[in-house]
Amino acid sequence: VDVKTLAPKLRHNMPDWLAQPLQEQLGEESFRALATSMNVAAPLDLRVNVFKAKREAVQLALAQAGIDAKPTPYSPWGLRVEGKPALQKLDVFLKGEVEVQDEGSQLLALLTGASRGQMVVDFCAGAGGKTLALGAMMRSTGRLYAFDVSGHRLDALKPRLARSGLSNVYPVQIAHERDD
């Protein structure tokens, strides 16, 4: 099938109500680049738990396990992995030295500037990816509250928190953003 002959919503894998305003705003060439990028699988990024390990050591351990990992372009904690390896079986994962986390989320944590001894609140903690990054930045000191309305998502944080080695994280389920 020649992709160029398909209807726009099929060609770009995007509904017309979204494609039309984007195309008008971006122009044809930029829109095509955006649509193409949205139809490609995202890379697999890892965040090294700097409370427990160094990026170079984790990269070496991954290489010894036959996994090609390169430093991410922007995050000083990140490694970009080729393919989709079974990370949950690796020693670096089991020991909490590495977590799956996209580079954008790593950068958000970095931008907070959280540091030792502070009190920090993550109001939409979910399963805790950014919470764990913040805790490592704080070197497991101070108090880090992980708030979320979903107890189920906070439950997913517990095994990750145990692996991380952090002791300054306090998960709290709240009713809503104005919870007393």
Regions found by a protein language model. Give the residues of each.
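S-adenosylmethionine
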Residues: 1-180
